[in-house]
Amino acid sequence: MKKILLALLTSCALVSCEGYFDQLPKTELPSETFYTSYDAALRNVAILYANAGHVNDGIMTSDRFMMPSLMNEGPFDLTSTSGSVLNLWSKHYAYIAQANLILERLETNKEVIDENAGHSALDKATITGSATEMLMGEVRFLRAYAYFTLYRYYGGVPLIIEPTGPKPDYVPRATRQEMFKFLYDEMAYALDKCLDNRSGIAYGRVTKGAVAGMLAKMKIFHASYIRRAEMYGRKQD
């Protein structure tokens, strides 16, 4: 009898524990909910905005900042492993990889995102076209800005525009023509999809004016005497 009672108690204890440890984490969102609504998609895009200030170590204006490694910049004694050079490269490509993944997920979940964009609790702007394409325009602008920054430092760099695995295949450096064709295509898409203006909590997000301003900067750089001497006279004319 005691053995039967013990077996019953043990089975009850095991049954009562079932599902107890299968709870969703309270400090992070499960991946399956990342793009199930417009607001969920917007939160992912917001990550890019939040990280935009970290790709170049921010602005260090206090005299308390001391970076002995930067002393190599004066005599131009920098190498590919110097901290400032390595960080600039790796941080921008980490940012680009994040943008590539977000773009892929936005495209995959476009239908469900567009369906409930009108019920957003985070974005009260009037969106006349596809809400997903608007978000993609913002992301493509931010990714293009990262590539433009890399080009200004290094010239042509590998153009990686799709998510890659842990060990991506070797990608050769893009030519100047390839770089600017990519940048202009990205700006054209963003100019078409982004909104005219933003206000309230959305103030600071990419607008058509921001895209036009950045596009002008890219074209001036493209036509500069240092980078494209044959176009310099045309720019002045």
Each language-model region and where it sits:
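Bacterial Sec-dependent N-terminal signal peptides
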Residues: M1-K26
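Acidic, serine/threonine/proline-rich low-complexity intrinsically disordered regions
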Residues: V157, I161-T164, Y170-R173, G213, ...
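Short coil/turn linking the two alpha-helices of tandem helical-hairpin repeats
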Residues: Y151-R152, P158, R198, F221-E230
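Membrane-proximal, proline-rich intrinsically disordered regions
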Residues: C17-T61
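Conserved, well-structured interaction surfaces
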Residues: P30, S37-L42, A46, G53, ...
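Proline-centered turn/helix-capping motifs that create local helix->coil transitions or kinks
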Residues: G19, N56-I59, L150-L159
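TPR/Sel1-like alpha-solenoid repeat signature
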Residues: R140, A212-L215
